[in-house]
Amino acid sequence: MAENLRFCGPALIADETMLHNVIQMITDIITKQHPCQLEFGPEEETAEAGEETSEFDWVVVDTALDVVSGMAAALGQSFAELWKVFEKTILRYASSGEALERATSVGVLAECINGMGAAVTPFTGTFLKLLLHRLNDEDPQTRSNAAYAVGRLVEHSQSDAEMLKEYPTILSRLEQCLSMNVSRLQDNATGCVSRMILRSREHVPTKEVLPVLVNILPLKNDFEENEPLYRMICQMYKWEDATIRELTPQLLPVFQAVLTGDEDQLEDERRAELIELVKWLNQMQAGAAPWVEQL
């Protein structure tokens, strides 16, 4: 159902009765009140089930949370009202003592932020407080998902005061993430920094940050983050940024790897923009990137 919601849109839950039933079912599952999650046997049998029962419970909850993120993708900004139904439970999981529960719920939160778009603005303060904490999480996957979620919040929230105030803290915590090559952490941290620069480059020390990003390129795990990354890089050239120009010799091999490698590394629009940039660089310095003429 989650995938159908993402690809087919809100038609699946357009009927009010259907929507109500789905919400009720999902709420029952994520609060562990659905009949399939209740134990009716003797206490001894329940105790013997132990870890196996716990793992089964989480698989069910995880599946329901996936439907929540699917609803966010399908409903867009109108999901903001529905978020209030799920908020308490999802945020509780995001502060769980179990790493898997934290990682999953923070990932769902990221997808909900992306789905809500600008409608996420009223929740900015609440989300930031949680996500800044999770950016220091001991679990790499939770930290990675938090970096992605913060990046999406930077992209969509219209609360400049709340977002820009936390830029120094976010950057400080992302600095550690960028040095950890685990669980897509570098990729999501790179995407987050890129979105921060695109939103307000004046609040990012790009002279120090850009060389760090370039040293870990090209991204190897999460190609979705190539979109904000190369949009940011192209924009920095348009802004005639001195630091990005100085980094051109290091960037050209990265551009070549991305443009001549697997096609799924870039969406068509970003690929076209990057090719245009490389052609311009090749004109400015004849022979700097002769391979671009074959694209």
What is the predicted role of each segment?
Residues M1-L295:
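Karyopherin-beta/Importin-beta family HEAT-repeat alpha-solenoid scaffold
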